[in-house]
């Protein structure tokens, strides 16, 4: 069953096949949590969002129609749940706490990397929702502009424009931080 297509698995899930659901979950849960973490800004919300998205897969499987690839549909569900959650609660980046330093690593270099990661995460968190989603889907999840466009329900040219604006905003924000502004 590991070679079964996502569409075949959804048909089996619609019939109540729990092993098919577990397989589909194994295929997508990890990347979905990664996507959700980058959008929501914390692990707990990301886990909850993915659990809710997987529940929707199970409950909506009988009504699911393969108008787009399952991955596109599933990421869209995850993204919508993330954006809804972000609208309810303010963004507090988990990266602000940082990871404990590796005692064997150069502490100064590790601290600088952690600070850079924190600043980038904060700058991404400050982007408008659609720009943030375009950046995360394209650069962190490795999706093509066409796949990102399908998830965001927009055109490829709109995704390209979102990416240009997002990168400009990130560059400006990070340059301002380097100059000591924020």
Go through each PLM region and give its residues.
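Short, charged helix-capping/linker segments at alpha-helix termini
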Residues: 2, 14-23, 33-52, 156, ...
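Internal acidic/polar
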Residues: 2-6, 84, 91-117, 122, ...
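C-terminal edge and immediately downstream basic/flexible tail or linker adjoining helix-turn-helix-like DNA-binding
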Residues: 12, 98, 114, 122, ...
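Sigma70-family region 2
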Residues: 14-15, 38-41, 52-69, 87-90
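Amphipathic, Lys/Arg- and hydrophobic-enriched alpha-helical face
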Residues: 25-43, 60, 124, 169, ...
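Residues within the DNA-recognition helix of helix-turn-helix
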Residues: 28, 49, 162-165, 169
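Arg/Lys-rich amphipathic alpha helix in sigma70-family domain 2
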Residues: 59-66, 76-95, 113, 174-176
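Helix-turn-helix DNA-binding module
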Residues: 121-125, 129-133, 137, 141-158
